[in-house]
């Protein structure tokens, strides 16, 4: 990850088995960690009380009195066509990112193969989509998009590596980006994968764009600006 901002402060923060690499100013480590752990506890407790929320691979409908944050996860994963369990890490990243943005106005976070970005000016973000260090693309993060969530195949577990060389999804949140990324990977194993995957990305509300890489073919959907 590369953020072109001179006075940003970078630090690692651990939330259960997640490691968040945070670039933000000022240094809000303690407040940030307290906020993240509070949300994680809420998420974990809700999943224990509502088993399908934490185990279903398919969309889950929650009761009307469910906490707003859990309703948001269920709604966004349903848009993608998958269960809430696939977006837990993205939801934590979103929560931390929104907290940091409320304190300092901007933040960049990387976690595994996901990124959260909110900046005041056009920023170049290098996202890695494969297993090698040179499997990276520099994309432009434009402030007009507001909060940006990015899913990539870098560092993901149990990927169908024979089906995709790289996948990048840009969405209005990490929660949505993660959920859409999971569904898109399934499409990559089907006939005519690029066409099906790009059409899917263009049809989901909240998805800003995506890049699909397979063999020598690259497909681009939506408002993705690749930096020179």
Segments (PLM) and residue ranges:
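N-terminal basic/disordered segments at the start of proteins
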Residues: 1-28
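Glycine-rich anion-binding loops and their surrounding alpha/beta cores
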Residues: 6-8, 126, 217-228
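Short beta-strand scaffold segments in enzyme catalytic cores
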Residues: 20-22, 114-118, 210-213
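Flexible, glycine/charged-enriched surface loops at secondary-structure junctions
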Residues: 46-61, 106-107, 112, 190-221
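Conserved mixed alpha/beta catalytic, RNA-binding, or beta-rich assembly cores of soluble enzyme
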Residues: 71-82, 86-96, 100, 104-197, ...
